[in-house]
Amino acid sequence: MANTIPFKLITPTQVVFEGDAELVIAVTTEGEEGILPSHAPFLAALKPGVLRANVRKDGNVERLELATREGFMQALPDRVTVLVDEALRFDDVDVAKAREEAASSDRVTADFGAAKLRLTGH
């Protein structure tokens, strides 16, 4: 059994990662699924969640963690391909901006609720 498997993570706009992985773990509609080299053929729908992979970089193993949206994962004995609507590395998350956007979303939701109450009375 090989120690790694070629792994590609793709969104509609870019190839987010392409390289060798020792392990790929994704959240499927049936639960978490881990893929190792020489895995039996497998196709799964993915739910939003955290995709984790132990990837090889410069001879070392690094943990790759990304927040992903819906998509699909195909595992073959010689490769793993993940197609998702969006993938974001945790290191790329701007926490202050995310909090600001969440607060803005809460305000919009509250405004919508108030407008609905005025129009319908409940």
How should each PLM-predicted stretch be described?
Residues 1-4:
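Short, charged, intrinsically disordered terminal tails
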Residues 6-99:
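Compact, glycine-rich, soluble single-domain proteins
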Residues 85-122:
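Acidic/glycine-rich phosphate/pyrophosphate-binding loops and surrounding catalytic core
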